[in-house]
């Protein structure tokens, strides 16, 4: 391609333009693609381009008061940079560029690339260097002469203000020439509407930055101001937010000042004076704790994004209704965004939604548009979403969807500034190349995210019964005040409100249960639960290849233990029969008898089945009893078998844990300075050490703990994506500051598999020596030092956590902080601990064993032993996954009863009350056997103590049993010792020790005083003759019996799919 260049001699290229990097290069690919878009539009739509024969982009010095000049936007779009002192003239087949020698050098390199030569071969490039000697007269004559040859109309940006010598000289020359100037501003804007993939990526990143600033900086700042009752003006808050954009390392360590800026100075509004226009600004009025509107937007590589949220403190019922309607309006507008839909139809959708709502009069308070296009320009003038814009949406467009109500009267406001308020919600969205809409800004906007209730303040307006606008406890309760957060309803007592909410939760659970049943059933109506085919399990290898491979020192008719093969050989009818140790369930003795119980398919756990420990044969020996005259031999055999079983079980447990481990991806280390906490303790400890001390570091995709106090220096890596719950408990009333991670997938730390990893620092000052005389105020001084130390450690932890949340990739990592005021004492494991709820879980993390219960996994909670005369009660949690065993927290002091009920209700957990303890294992087994029947029979309603009481009250004074009651108590019966079948089951396979203990308990029960308070024995096995309040059926599925005889055995024929124990008993036979 030929070039005509009238330029002065060029020295070595100085590659920097003022706003670009030092070694600036122009992207040939983007340039070619976007020049084609410009020429295609110019050639195809002469009306849009006003029949212009040539086009001009002229920039002298940028207008600092207008960061979104049209010419700079076009320069950025074409070349990636703002190019000062540059004039570009586009002709039909030529492009003329006038600029400084340094920039000309860049343009020449661009024009000489193979891509430009190939894709823009029809266009000739001409470069003219600025000539100050004649004030560019010759250059301008050349440009105007070529433009005149092309035609009489020259396209310019009419309203652009020219600044700088070059631009003013060009303006004068253009005014003196005979060419007719036509305005091509709309045509140039049309080129910017549809974004390519690179532009979309920039806007997505910009939206993430915007979301991070609001979520992690502006909102916490506002909450702190409200919490402490500080006085700060809107402008002070706006300046604080602007400083975050100007220091992008506070947002993410990957961001740089060159690429990040704010789209506009953030806007904070409150106190009755609101402006919903994009041109609004903050004022010097103090922040009012009523309705607060926050707007902010980031600019990443010159591409803009925007977000706005309204936060409401102590709203009236009207405010809640209006906000719910506004949410619905924005949701419907976003759903209506599709290719080839007109901009005006989106506005019409918003108006329609308001008119169809319960408050159609809000139309009068709705703005004249629902947003606009956004990209390099913050507001794309051709893409305003109003009632008159007939342009259509195209894939690749990005929009700022802004919906609001302005100047709404609020006569019930708590003060004069609350009498008028406005609402605004705004999000940046993308209509992607697949024609689907994506919301790019990610900050909560549900009522539970934006509504705050200051405790202790009456809300006379909370008598609204509309479930669509029901005020919920915010999901991310930040503790705006140190007081208990509460909502009061004037027309209802607390108990009535709670009861109504519980009924609503019950209906919600029923709906979820229906969905669960549908998911478990295939289209043919068959259950989706797979059956286990025992005949297909062949993982156990043959122990001995033949009888000749038996050990040489074996003695006929004597039991033999072979540790090498992990096998016990039993004499049966004169033959030595080998049994792998995994087939032996337990072994016991009584006087001169030794009794062995075997595992059979009905007594194997699912893990054992999955591990392949179920033999494929269909005939199984369930028990065998031998008479051994020598007590020493008997004791030695039992000892050897138990030791072998323990060794095997330990090894298999470790192997199974290792098999189940998920392989983690590698930790990506950050270079340079990264967040770290020194002298931190870790739990679990490494290699059995008493303490493990080291350095906690935050990196790109996870946390690393580098131990410094142990011989084992293997680091502990926790990836962000593997963290289910991140918990921070500060050293307030506790003696340690703790960062605790509850994981999705377990880690192997040392030889221990764990889902809970903890890092902490103990607050331990040097104790005062008792043999040294103390000063009068030593104790006070020590308390002061401890408080100062706690404050320092808390600040260090908070700084580290804040940096971790900034580094963690989207959707980000947020730390839960427990609510101490909602805590209570209980026994979740083996000892009494203080248990606290947080936003997402119930936890006790100060001492191992740790307890972390995910509240989202809970279906119901059940209060057990909820009797006023008792000093404590129990609380059980049943999970949505019925395969998970329920968890019980025992011995909770009675004075916490109302507190626990209140927070369970606030966290939307349905609870029941009962005067007894349930055998949850039996209940869950019954439910899992037929989930559909369980829910058809009323589901969890059998746990409802209040309903039971109502039924009892409605009947006669005397108790009358009936068939209906027996049917309704199908599941309640599970708390007793079990059905007759279960009793028969438990009479087989019990060892002698169990039988003796059972007999002793039966004797004691005869003298049991019915007037005494019921005592709970956690280790007791339920009796078959009385209801039990503790776990029943602790003995194995084999049970009872056993007699004398030198060699007796019971066997059962079990189907390949696992017959019930009753069928096993009926088909007893001897193994041949």
From Swiss-Prot:
Residue ranges, compositional bias (Basic and acidic residues): 995-1020
Localization per record: Nucleus; Chromosome
SUPFAM superfamilies (alphabetical): Creatinase/aminopeptidase
GO biological process per UniProt: DNA repair; DNA replication; regulation of chromatin organization; transcription elongation by RNA polymerase II
Record-level Gene Ontology MF annotations: nucleosome binding
The protein's role, per its UniProt record: Component of the FACT complex, a general chromatin factor that acts to reorganize nucleosomes. The FACT complex is involved in multiple processes that require DNA as a template such as mRNA elongation, DNA replication and DNA repair. During transcription elongation the FACT complex acts as a histone chaperone that both destabilizes and restores nucleosomal structure.
Alphabetized PANTHER family for the sequence: CDC68 RELATED, FACT COMPLEX SUBUNIT SPT16
Protein name per its UniProtKB record: FACT complex subunit SPT16
Organism: Dictyostelium discoideum (Social amoeba)
